């Protein structure tokens, strides 16, 4: 199991949580490959992955074997789409990977989805920082909302 996250073009993503999750599940059916070429994505996402790979090299790159000798947990697995990049990391590097992904998302103005979070947090760039745009609502609040609407 890995720690997973996704960065994406904010303009491409739906703004409400349910629609976003539908978009995410459509993207992760992996029907629009190949997914190993950074040139096929946007300039902002390309810049993000290029910098992310300085800290967490691509496990599918020719240089991966060199990094395996030092610390196999340092490698990242990158799936590169036109409007998103899905990235997986060793759980032992989750905090470091999340921190670097967030820093670079702010720098490059891309959205960030914490795939491994129980709350399904989606962050969008706003004036050089990231703000929580939406997340999964707790079951209690979903039930309360339905009751209040008479369902």
What does each model-identified segment do?
Residues 1-151:
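Acidic (Asp/Glu-rich) sequence patches and key acidic residues
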